A protein has these predicted regions:
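Active-site metal-binding loops of divalent metal-dependent hydrolases
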Residues: 9, 44, 67, 217-219
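Hydrophobic "anchor" residues on beta-strands that sit immediately upstream
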Residues: 4, 61, 214
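Conserved acidic, metal-coordinating active-site core of Asp-based
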Residues: 102-216, 220-222
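Asp-based phosphoryl-transfer active-site loop
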Residues: 3-17
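Conserved strand-loop elements at the edges of beta-sheets that form or border functional pockets
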Residues: 7, 43, 64, 178-181
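Active-site phosphate-binding/coordination module
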Residues: 19-123
Length: 222
């Protein structure tokens, strides 16, 4: 018997407008009424989930930032953070910069986004404190703070080729994935953490076994 449904958001449950369609929302509500727990599992940071809270009354959880954060939707608070150590991100950044010297690099904590390189703003910065700074300098100030996500964006490059080159360069230091269709944007984090890992830990803490979980998504980070 299924006790937990874990689903990606973008491209799976919601469209580009970040809205549930009535049929989808009705299905989720029916599952909850049947006693099934709903957990959203997304690459998005927790600060972007206000529209989800506004469309639902779920007193449940979301696994955010590719598994680095567990966020309680009902309480609107981050419960746990399992990010990457700053030294691993520093090593990865030192290796990637010479390979992609004109790229835009981004480093995220729960509430702050550090950016190195050109950017246009927009949704990626919504709800965050933004610091334009060379990332090695930013990492110098991390006194035990964990990196939620580290990203590299190389406009005009084929996403599959970019992912392969990044993985070849830093795959032994960090996890390497992507979550945006057709976009040359690679997401990196803790080598041992991903959506599946955090979901498994979450289910175990709630006494739910693997065969009682239904999970689905549409991108490599799923």
């Amino acid at each position: 018997m299924i006790r937990l449904i874990a689903s990606d958001l973008d491209g799976t449950l919601i469209g580009k407008d970040f809205r549930f369609r009535p049929r989808t929302l009705h299905a989720l509500q029916a599952a909850r009424a049947a006693g099934i727990q709903i957990v959203f599992v997304t690459g998005r940071p927790s600060r972007w989930l206000t529209p989800i809270r506004e469309q639902t009354d779920f007193d449940s959880y979301a696994i955010c930032s590719n598994g680095a954060v567990i966020y309680h939707l009902g309480a609107d608070e981050v419960e746990t953070v399992n990010g990457a150590p700053a030294h691993a991100i520093r090593s990865a950044h030192e290796l990637l910069q010479p390979v992609f010297p004109n790229a835009t690099y981004t480093l995220e904590t729960v509430d702050t986004v550090y950016i190195q390189g050109p950017y246009e703003g927009g949704e990626v910065l919504e709800g965050a404190r933004v610091v334009e700074q060379h990332l090695l300098g930013a990492l110098d100030g991390f006194a035990g703070e964990q990196v939620i996500k580290y990203l590299v964006h190389v406009p005009g490059m084929d996403p599959d080729i970019l992912q392969a080159r990044v993985a070849q360069t830093v795959g032994e230091l960090v996890s390497v994935t992507r979550g945006v269709v057709g976009e040359p944007l690679i997401e990196m984090g803790s080598k041992t953490v991903n959506k599946g890992y955090t979901l498994a830990q979450f289910a175990a803490r709630h006494g739910i076994e693997a065969h009682e979980v239904m999970a689905f998504g549409d991108m490599p980070n799923d």
